[in-house]
Amino acid sequence: MNAPDPVVPPLHDDEDDNNDVFLDDHDIIHEYVMDGEDLPDAEDGSESEHEEGDDDDFVHKFTGHTGELYSVACSPTDTTLVATGGSDDRGFLWKIGEGDWAFELQGHEESVSSLAFSYDGHRLASGSLDGIIKVWDVSANWEARQLEGPGGGIEWLRWHPRGHILLAGSEDFTVWMWNTDSAIVLNTFVGHGSSVTCGDFTPDGKIICTGSDDATLRIWNPRSAENIHVVRGHPYHTEGLTCLAINSTSTLALTGSKDGSVHIVNITTGRVVDNNALASHTDSIECVGFAPSDSWAASGGMDKKLMIWDIEHFLPRGTCEHEEGVTCLAWLGASYVATGCVDGKVRLWDSRSGECVKTFNGHSDAIQSLSVSANRDYLVSASLDETACVFEVGNFR
């Protein structure tokens, strides 16, 4: 993974049963266009440079880094524990509301590009552009393992939903999987023709999906490393994939691309099932995500738009217009979705109405990553301005 541009930013033995997909190619699609909601008027001129202390909305600001931040992750079990990483070759563990405590994740020799907590919160993985992954014991605050293998920078990290199995995508076109308790490589997934930019386990842990700059989605058997499906060509993306999300039933993959397209793939069959109905963006897609209910999803792009989609019917529910490109998003619950933007602002949107219900100030440069605390009371943003901000979002579920 190249450092983000300053402008654009245990396997179980259950039988291999396949869940039915609740939509298919024969669904009748009626597409309509919903007028986008204008943002509330900016106060004191939106073009002026942000000055700290002027209408800031954060309840905590972490300033321990000395370079741009690229990644943030909140613990799934500790409601105050946060990890951040960036271009200063360092990561930090710190706590919301405890400004005098921080633990430095030392030892990386290049930018810390990705962070991820294990499902139980006991482990934290940090990946770097030097191709090294470090696994940290969170309770003891020490490095438990160093994982090696990839020949290029780490693009992303994901944990198995029920074990200390770690998956990583690399710039060297490969995907690696380790047992982090022993540091043993379990499998290497080879087949992509370019950097592997996104990927994840399905929530049931049975399948791996990966997307690449080669414009393909690959669906893998994690035990055998067999490539079950390769999704490419018409009607799929024509340029590299940038982001990926999988629904809670492990049946659908939502992907975004540099070409401005968003597609839905049936994981079981490997078929594109959206009939090109999700075609509203005009620039690179930077982020996608399913709502907790799976019936809705969101996509954000450099065309300054957040699109809300009705996944059951392939219909646009709303267009949320921004002042600059949308770099990241996070669902706060069934109704509200947060966006991070190139203009340094974090916005909350009501997905039912398309209205911007809150704009958070606190950053002076582009937002690169968002994460929600375990109790969903806090939203944490990481920015190119070298800081992370914490915002209260408990009233938006």
Where are these regions (language model features)?
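Conserved strand-to-loop turn within each blade of WD40 beta-propeller repeats
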Residues: 85-88, 127-130, 169-172, 210-214, ...
